[in-house]
Amino acid sequence: MRFWLLLITALFLAGCSSHRAPAPNARLSDSIAVIAGLNDQLQTWHGTPYRYGGMSRSGVDCSGFVLMTMRDKFDLQLPRDTRTQSKIGTEIAKDDLLPGDLVFFKTGSGESGLHVGIYDTNNQFIHASTSRGVMRSSLDNVYWRKNFWQARRI
């Protein structure tokens, strides 16, 4: 009898501790509007070359592109650098990604070894690539899959 009581209690407590990703910021809660905003930003910036520290159409880095996209399209203020951006919001599982979530990669060592983009849809994200400038990439790409570090919901 005691065994069954313990088993039922354990199952009940396990059910109470289910993992749920946090809800997105109210400005990012309408996935259709977020996708439209991201597509508009990508269309405007597509092909803009990568430039470390850049924040203009003549050159932009990954954290600058993320900062400007969130500010200009969703009225959200983010820190300027990738390391600090990687600490805001709540870490979420890759399987829980929604449009507007930030995706982070460890592509090298030190501060310059971090990369950030914004999850779009269908396992795609937009970002400023060091080799190809502002573009859309797939999280299924071997390079991005291998270097994926974390995802955050703001």
Give the predicted meaning of each segment.
Residues A10-V34:
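Bacterial Sec signal peptide processing site at the extreme N-terminus
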Residues A26-L28, L76-M135:
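...with weaker cross-activation on analogous glycine-rich loops/strands in unrelated enzymes
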Residues M1-W4:
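Positively charged n-region of N-terminal signal peptides that target proteins for export
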Residues V142-I154:
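Glycine- and charge-enriched low-complexity intrinsically disordered segments
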Residues R57-M70:
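Active-site nucleophilic cysteine motif
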Residues N25-S29, P49-R57, K106:
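Second-shell loop/turn segments in exported
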Residues L38, L42-V60:
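Extracytoplasmic/periplasm-facing segments of secreted or lipoprotein envelope proteins
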Residues L42-Y50, T69-L78, T107, S129, ...:
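Sec/Tat-exported extracytoplasmic proteins
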